[in-house]
Amino acid sequence: MASVKRNFLFNILLVTSNIVFPVLVFPYIARILGPQGLGNAHFALQFSKYFVTTASLGIPIYGLREVAKVKNHKAKLSKLVSELLLLNIITAFLSFGVYAIVLYSSGTLAQNFDLFAIASLQVLLGFLAIDWLFAGLEDFKIITVRSLTIRLITVLFLLFFVKTKNDVFPYLLISILSILLGHLWNLFYATTKVKFSFKNLNISAHLKPIFIIFLMNLCIAMYTIFDTVWVGFLSTATAVGMYISAVKLSKIGIPIVSALGTVLLPRSARTFAANINNPIHLQTSFNFIVDLAVPIGVGMFLLAPELLFVFSGAAFSDALIAMRLLSFLPLFIGLSNLFGMQILSASGNDKLVLKSVFIGMLINVVLNVILVPKFAHNGAALAIVITEGIVTLVTFYFAFKKFAIRFNTKRFARDFAACVTFLPLIWLFKTYLTSPSLIIVGSLTACAIIYLSLQHFWFKNEFVNQAIVTVKKKLNK
């Protein structure tokens, strides 16, 4: 339990940086590059990221699970990591070849050839992304230290080199190089954990179990990564910029909601491997997700105009509808990760996850083709919300059917009831304050105090109560 708490604290620190970094950087970048420049850069980033996902074959999920099983056997661990790395190197080069062919043959991509060319670096070197090794080893300290260091360097470079709306290429280059620097850091540190050797390897042994996860990842990527690409191909660069602005803001809450699940995933894999079909920590994870995602969603929906103005600028006001549509995305994604990753995938039921995300992919493709040409970024936002909602329901159905795992769904009603108090509070701040920044700060502070007070005094929330006990112990020392 101590290791879970320690890793959770490191993950919270990482999550905090995941929030602080966009909060510091995105408002600056959005105002400098504008909707069109931001759209062009992220069109290239997301398009190349799809090929990175293809090349990864599902190794991040499979590797984490398998590393967790052999973490205490260094020889087996070294062989496993070497085999998966070699396999990823092969697929990365194949994916890079396909990327190059598509780039040279597409008229749409050729309009910004330099951007897509520099983005190809993350396709070619994507095999160096081995966070799955450290997550499987439950070594979240290295992931956190690396991320904080590189993000600090990235912020400094962005402030120094991105100064006008014409600096789209420097922005993209810095973004790509920061990713690659993180990969190299991973590889260097990995040499202290495993002994790499490319002799007597058997990569074919991993192909069958990885194949299902590979298909699963492709389906997921079609609606979590390719959503931006749909807007780029079926609408305009400006629409991409609007969509990215809404998505960036709505997804700020996802790392918070997923923090506990990320730490517990290796433990879920070991628990199911030991034939324990109803781990207690799953209810804890469910409660944690709902308790955080519900107020985050309600708050984002009510404060969407002010959030967009402060973090993106007046030029992104057309993203308001998309922002409100996406406000409950953290809830859907948090729960689908619980049902899909922590339960079905961790227990080896990847085929059921594949069925779930395949259904989601088909629905998303149809919705994007219908909605994006007519409603641009708003259509893409509606498509992804419907898709994530359906995937959440389907994964829950399979998890319940397979293990008869039950969750306290009254948690939803309780948390939404607590959030009803947000309406008059935020209305008061919007009525008597004119500064969007002050409205946000005042509303968040007041709503957080009321929500936590209700959770503690009225609902006896275990997370809030434990936090208070911990703080009291620290103060009494």
Segments (PLM) and residue ranges:
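N-terminal membrane topogenesis motif
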Residues: M1-V23, A75-S78, T191, N200-M216, ...
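Signature of the first transmembrane helix
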Residues: S3-I61, F96, A100, V155, ...
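Helix-loop junctions and terminal segments of transmembrane helices
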Residues: P27, S56-N72, S250-A293, G340-A346
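Interfacial segments at transmembrane-helix termini and the short loops linking adjacent helices
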Residues: V102-A119, M300-L335
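Membrane-interface junctions at transmembrane-helix termini in multi-pass inner-membrane proteins
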Residues: F113, V123-S147, F328-I359
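Hydrophobic alpha-helical transmembrane segments
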Residues: S120, T144-T192, F358-I363, H377-F398, ...
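Interhelical loop/hinge segments that connect adjacent transmembrane helices in multipass membrane
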Residues: T144, V168-S175, L184-T224, V263, ...
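Membrane-proximal transmembrane or re-entrant/amphipathic helices at the cytosolic face
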Residues: W427-K477
